A protein has these predicted regions:
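Aromatic-lined carbohydrate-recognition surfaces of secreted/lumenal glycan-active proteins
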Residues: 1-7
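Short, solvent-exposed helix-loop connector elements
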Residues: 59-66
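Structural preference for long, well-ordered alpha-helical segments in enzyme cores
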Residues: 73-77
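A polyampholytic, Gly/Pro-enriched intrinsically disordered region
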Residues: 17-25
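Carbohydrate-interacting/catalytic domains
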Residues: 8-18, 30-44, 64, 80-86, ...
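A cross-family glycoside hydrolase active-site/sugar-binding cleft signature
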Residues: 1, 52-53, 87
Length: 233
């Protein structure tokens, strides 16, 4: 457990993983500048962070985040590099905070909406790419307005597999253009890419020229996310 900015000190002492309390607070309270700063940290450091939406000290996820926010924050925390931590009964949407000294719990019915969201994320992140792949933060430029700062985009790559994640962590619609210029697509000569969203099964065909030249235009409503599996032809 790492609080009060002690993460690097504990890692220097030999701990393998430390809580990412800073990112949790930034996401919970929608401090987008802080979110951007946290995910821009060196990958060598981020690999040692524990990403969480609740633990035995914090409020239950179902209380801390309104139901409409769950899709974006769970996709975000569940697809970042580092350790992904899930508290007992978090997936089921439990709301009663459990003191660690208590040896019994109050039974709560599972929330089907919460279970459905987490099951999709857990199913997607079972794939090797989220454990053995290379992660990159992706730049997003403005497109038509100044809302792109509410979006976070990043990718995972492993051999020919390619995932692109875009999340809107704010309470208003946001749009922008995701650039792959710093990390060109592996299939650079592809005529077309298909972005298959593993959250809602939607498919978005895009020309290879557009992706290489201009990037990917995205628009997400408040607290929505994309978890793309990208294929090429």
């Amino acid at each position: 457990e790492a609080y009060w900015g002690t993460q690097q000190r504990l890692l220097d002492l030999g701990f393998s993983f430390v809580y990412d309390k800073g990112l949790y607070d930034a996401v919970r309270y929608e401090k987008m500048a802080d979110v951007h700063g946290q995910v821009a940290a060196a990958l060598a450091y981020q690999k040692h962070l524990v990403r969480f939406l609740e633990n035995h000290d914090e409020d239950r996820c179902a209380d801390a985040f309104a139901p409409g926010r769950l899709a974006s924050v769970a996709t975000f925390m569940g697809t970042l590099p580092g350790m992904r931590f899930y508290q007992e009964s978090e997936i089921e949407g439990a709301k009663i905070h459990l003191p660690v000294a208590l040896r019994r719990v109050v039974e709560e019915p599972a929330n089907p909406a919460s279970v459905a969201i987490f099951e999709k994320i857990l199913q997607a992140t079972k794939q090797d790419i989220f454990h053995k792949g290379l992660w990159h933060l992706l730049p997003i430029s403005s497109e038509g307005d100044d809302s792109s700062g509410n979006l976070i985009a990043y990718e995972w790559r492993l051999e020919n597999a390619w995932k692109v994640i875009v999340v809107n962590l704010a309470g208003a619609a946001a749009q922008g253009r995701v650039s792959f210029a710093d990390h060109p697509p592996a299939a650079q000569q592809a005529r077309q890419y298909t972005f298959h969203d593993e959250l809602d099964d939607a498919r978005y065909p895009r020309s290879g020229d557009e992706i290489r030249r201009a990037g990917l235009f995205v628009r997400r409503e408040a607290y929505q996310a994309h978890l793309f599996d990208v294929s090429s032809a």
